[in-house]
From Swiss-Prot:
Catalytic machinery residues: 115
UniProt name for this protein: DNA ligase
NCBIfam families for this protein: dnlj (TIGR00575), PRK07956.1 (NF005932)
Originating species: Oceanobacillus iheyensis (strain DSM 14371 / CIP 107618 / JCM 11309 / KCTC 3954 / HTE831)
Family recorded in the similarity comment: Belongs to the NAD-dependent DNA ligase family. LigA subfamily.
Length: 667
């Protein structure tokens, strides 16, 4: 064969093998024996070996390969991967349905799906090619695990879809694979994984993709982050179209027209969850209409149009051996139960929450008691009650100390608070917890500065304040345990990079009481610089939407403290930037025809890419959304605009051509 013939042969083998793989891994309905598949694969491998320049990206041979990575790169999700609010009973579900119905004028239907117990991931395709796979991370920033995801054979390396498509799903380990993996680990005298979720997450975070390839992972796709060329109008249409494109979706989803149908679905799977070949930990319920999803919108943490029903928590009994106290960054003293190890909901539990002194006293929980442990939402273990009838008289009552176990200062109970608190600003436990918070992902996001490293730096007296982090030098760090040349270099680079963070990250990292990440962003947008915020009065802060009196009081008191002024001065001198880097109110166009308008883009654009058009509209003060609703002001229609244009015309929404957008830009 000449090279052109070889190229055609390779193309036909890839097409055939990918079809066989789709039938086997996605449809679970193979049409050829394994031996025939293997023979065709060997033929392809030989041709690719003889003609390496003809190897194609969507070849099944490209699923595993390449050297192990040094580390995972960070990935920013264009559309955040938010977590869902939780429902634990029928009333929670009915309340969710009522809130959703109150938020829209039209009748609501729901889609119910099994909540797969695995690792949330994102897959991005550009013009049909799989270009990136990432973990959810904190919802805004994840890790690039493309090489590992390529080893999952139910993930297509190419699809027939132009433009950008980002799909979301759950990578998981089937029961059969989990049992086989743990058998192998025990045979090799390795620690077995506690549950399939941990096994799946651990496999996908291996730097060597060949390890992930051996773990027999699978995936279900359940949603869309971005879809450049879609005119679909419902979540159920998304699921159907994803399946048509070759993605593996879970067949057990159901469209429900009433909340009673939803509850019936939930009850069925609560009873039958153990019949499945994979783990589920609940049911996800979503409003089906994309327009209604748009209307309902989001809170800071989750969409208002979806909720996760969590199965009833599992319980187990064990012995409470001791009660330890920990001090948080705000000085709150939290008791934790130390337990004899016990298996609950697939994991081994040795510590559990006791919340506060009042709970211990009210429930008469004693050291030495037999106690019932429950995993709330199958995640956080907590002590539910003591088994009083099993007491033998040796149990000891627990009393909270009068002094802080970390610094010896008197513990106090502030007005209207249940918890005891240490109010010593120099308490070492609070300082250390504050540093751990400062470097965390939602705050300054300093890679390589995990809890263990912070504790080590604190105990070695190298870091006592946030400013000290920016004074660390290479020689000091090299003296620490497990800190080699490369890890020290990477750490110092990460610390240096964090100096360029936008103001909201620094504000959140400072740990001001009552100020979460959303409030920090609101303050940063409003005041734009740390200096402006430091000068702000109580009235200035309270005047901002979403900032209440407790927050305003906390902010003003915080910046009035001398040690805070000194800390911020030190951070400035060390090069930490203190300005908001997002779109500023003072820079937003207010005289533009698009200012304050909600805009939808549809159809194919000739002069602008979707991304360029979106950036232009936002720079002129507009907001771009994905679907047409009564809240839409303008629809900009390119060629083949489809159903979004039809809906805009029915609703009487202003429709622009691409030329009209260009004319506005020209002005």
């Amino acid at each position: 064969m000449n090279k052109e013939q070889v190229s055609k042969k390779i193309e036909s083998l890839i097409e055939l093998l990918n079809q066989y793989g789709y039938e086997y891994y996605v449809l679970d309905n193979p049409t050829v024996p394994d031996a025939e598949y293997d023979q065709k694969l060997r033929e392809l491998q030989q041709l690719e070996q003889d003609f390496p320049d003809l190897v194609m990206e969507n070849s099944p041979t490209q699923r595993v390969g390449g050297a192990p990575l040094a580390s995972f790169q960070k990935v920013t999700h264009n559309v955040p991967m938010l977590s869902l609010g939780n429902a634990f009973n029928e009333q929670d579900l009915r309340d969710f349905a009522r809130r959703a119905s109150n938020g829209t004028d039209q009748p609501i239907s729901f889609v119910c799906e099994l909540k797969i117990d695995g690792l949330a991931i994102s897959l991005t395709y550009e013009n049909g090619k799989f270009v990136r796979g990432a973990t959810r991370g904190d919802g805004t920033i994840g890790e690039d695990i493309t090489s590992n995801l390529k080893t999952i054979r139910s993930i297509p390396l190419s699809i027939k879809e132009q433009g950008t498509l980002e799909v979301r799903g759950e990578a998981y380990m089937p029961h059969k694979s989990f049992l086989a993996l743990n058998e192998l680990r025990e045979k090799n005298e390795e620690e077995p994984f506690a549950n399939p979720r941990n096994a799946a997450a651990g496999s996908l975070r291996q730097l060597d993709p060949k390890i992930a390839a051996k773990r027999n992972l699978d995936i279900f796709l359940y949603g869309v982050g971005e879809w450049e060329n879609s005119d679909l109008t419902s979540h159920s249409e998304h699921l159907t179209r994803l399946k048509e494109l070759g993605f593996k979706t879970n067949k057990e989803w159901k469209k429900c027209n009433t909340i009673d149908e939803v509850i019936e679905y939930v009850n069925y799977w609560t009873e039958h969850r153990n019949d499945l070949s994979y783990e589920i930990d609940g049911i996800v319920i979503k409003v089906d209409s994309l327009d209604q999803q748009e209307e309902l919108g989001f809170t800071a943490k989750s969409p208002r149009w979806a909720i996760a029903y969590k199965f009833p928590a599992e319980e187990a009994m064990t012995t409470l051996r001791d009660i330890e106290l920990s001090i948080g960054r705000t000085g709150v003293v939290t008791p934790t139960a130390i337990l004899d190890p016990v298996r609950v909901a697939g994991t081994t539990v040795q510590r559990a929450s006791l919340h506060n002194e009042d709970l211990i006293r009210e429930q008469d929980i004693r050291i030495g008691d037999k106690v019932v442990i429950k995993k709330a939402g199958d995640i956080i273990p907590k002590v539910v009650r003591s088994v009083v009838e099993q007491r033998n008289g040796d149990e000891q009552e627990f009393h909270m100390p009068d002094e802080c176990p970390a610094c010896g200062n008197e513990l106090v109970r502030l007005e209207e608070e249940v918890a005891l608190r240490c109010i010593n600003p120099n308490c070492p436990a609070q300082l250390m917890e504050g540093l751990i918070h400062f470097v965390s992902r939602n705050a300054m996001n300093i890679d390589g500065l995990g809890e263990k490293v912070i504790i080590q730096l604190f105990q070695e007296n190298l870091v006592q304040t946030m400013a000290d982090l920016y004074r660390l030098d290479k020689e000091e760090l090299l003296q620490l345990e497990r800190m080699g040349e490369k890890s020290v270099t990477n750490l110092l680079e990460a610390i240096e990079k964090s100096k360029e963070n936008s103001l909201e990250r620094l504000l959140f990292g400072l740990g001001i009481r009552f100020i979460g990440s959303k409030a920090a962003k609101t303050l940063a947008m409003e005041f734009e610089t740390m200096e402006n915020l430091q000068k702000a009065t109580y009235e200035d802060v309270l005047a901002i939407d979403e900032i209440g009196d407790k927050m305003a009081d906390s902010i003003v008191q915080y910046f009035a403290e001398e040690k805070v002024t000194e800390l911020l001065s030190n951070l400035r001198e060390l090069g930490v930037q203190m300005e908001y880097k997002g779109p500023r109110k003072s820079e937003q166009a207010t005289d533009s025809v698009l200012s304050g308008k909600t805009v939808v883009l549809t159809g194919k654009m000739e002069k602008f890419s979707r991304k360029e058009a979106k950036e232009i509209i936002e720079s002129l003060g507009g907001t771009v959304t994905g679907s047409v609703s009564k809240k839409t002001d303008i629809v900009i229609a390119g060629e083949d605009a489809g159903s979004k244009l039809d809906k805009a015309e029915k609703l009487g929404i202003d429709v622009w051509s691409e030329q009209q957008l260009e004319d506005v830009v020209g002005k």
